[in-house]
């Protein structure tokens, strides 16, 4: 094993990377409330893992969506547990995100030179809410259908471009298969990709600038 490690160490300098990560200075004022952002990240990873598992059985069609969710809950081994963890972890993600925002605001973590870190955090908050909106529709039950109808109908009040925005969101004039397809694509591909990108940016800026000082 040592020879294999030495081979990689010679080419990638693994030890130098490990030393840099482990030797990062942590200010003495840091407490458990500074871990809230990390809990959000862990919740996101759980979302990705459980969501990916459900894509093997979920069918994004108006005729089969609800039936496929029922199948996951009743017939797939541990399917009920996977879907329940998916739902619980999103609740945890939203709660921890709200608490994280309060902690950052109260400790002044948004001030110079960390303005961009705050901006990426706000974008991540919007993406998190978007996950909830798009995911709510996927079972395509009565609650999901009417929730989507109301949410996608909100832009209709915007002058001139409102109707076009509604049609873009719904994939047509009315809520239907086009809407479900769009929301499924957003929920399983577009939003996770954007979230991963902005999380990486968020972490790199924190890594570069360090943790903000106490009040």
Swiss-Prot record:
Keyword terms of this UniProt record: Chloroplast, Electron transport, Heme, Iron, Membrane, Metal-binding, Photosynthesis, Plastid, Thylakoid, Transmembrane, Transmembrane helix, Transport
GO CC, any one term: chloroplast thylakoid membrane
Residue sites binding heme b 1 per the record: 100, 202
Pfam families found in the cross-reference section: Cytochrome_B (PF00033)
Binding site for heme c: 35
Binding of heme b 2, residues: 86, 187
Subcellular location(s) of the protein: Plastid, Chloroplast thylakoid membrane
Claim: Disulfide bond is one of the keywords in the record: no
Membrane-related topology note: Multi-pass membrane protein
Transmembrane region(s): 32-52, 90-110, 116-136, 186-206
One term of GO molecular function: oxidoreductase activity
Cofactor binding, per record: Binds 2 heme b groups non-covalently with two histidine residues as axial ligands. Binds one heme group covalently by a single cysteine link with no axial amino acid ligand. This heme was named heme ci.
Reported cofactor(s): heme b; heme c
Principal localisation: plastid
InterPro entries on file: Cyt_b/b6_N (IPR005797), Cyt_B6_PetB (IPR023530), Cytb/b6-like_sf (IPR027387), Cytochrome_b_N_euk/bac (IPR048259), Di-haem_cyt_TM (IPR016174)
Family to which the UniProt record says this protein belongs: Belongs to the cytochrome b family. PetB subfamily.
Function: Component of the cytochrome b6-f complex, which mediates electron transfer between photosystem II (PSII) and photosystem I (PSI), cyclic electron flow around PSI, and state transitions.
PANTHER family: CYTOCHROME B
Other comments on record: Heme 1 (or BH or b566) is high-potential and absorbs at about 566 nm, and heme 2 (or BL or b562) is low-potential and absorbs at about 562 nm.
Subunit structure: The 4 large subunits of the cytochrome b6-f complex are cytochrome b6, subunit IV (17 kDa polypeptide, PetD), cytochrome f and the Rieske protein, while the 4 small subunits are PetG, PetL, PetM and PetN. The complex functions as a dimer.
The protein's name in its UniProt record: Cytochrome b6
Species of the source: Pyropia yezoensis
Species lineage: Eukaryota, Rhodophyta, Bangiophyceae, Bangiales, Bangiaceae
């Amino acid at each position: 094993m040592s020879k294999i490690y030495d081979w990689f160490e010679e080419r990638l300098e693994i030890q130098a990377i490990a030393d840099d990560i482990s030797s990062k200075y942590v200010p003495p004022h840091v407490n458990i409330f500074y871990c809230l952002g990390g809990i959000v990240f862990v919740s996101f990873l759980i979302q990705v893992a459980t969501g990916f598992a459900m894509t093997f059985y979920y069918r994004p069609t108006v005729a089969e969506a609800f039936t496929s969710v029922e199948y996951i809950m009743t017939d797939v081994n541990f399917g009920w547990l996977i879907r329940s963890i998916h739902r619980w972890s999103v609740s945890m993600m939203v709660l921890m995100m709200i608490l994280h925002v309060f902690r950052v605001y109260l400790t002044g973590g948004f001030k110079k030179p960390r303005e961009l870190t705050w901006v990426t955090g706000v974008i991540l908050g919007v993406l998190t809410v978007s996950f909830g909106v798009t995911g709510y529709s996927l079972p395509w039950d009565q609650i999901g259908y009417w929730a989507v109808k109301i949410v996608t109908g909100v832009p209709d009040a915007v002058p001139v471009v409102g109707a076009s925005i509604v049609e873009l969101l719904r994939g047509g004039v009315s809520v239907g298969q086009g809407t479900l397809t769009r929301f499924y694509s957003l929920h399983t591909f577009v939003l996770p990709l954007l979230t991963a990108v902005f999380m990486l940016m968020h972490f790199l800026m924190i890594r570069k600038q360090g943790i903000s000082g106490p009040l």
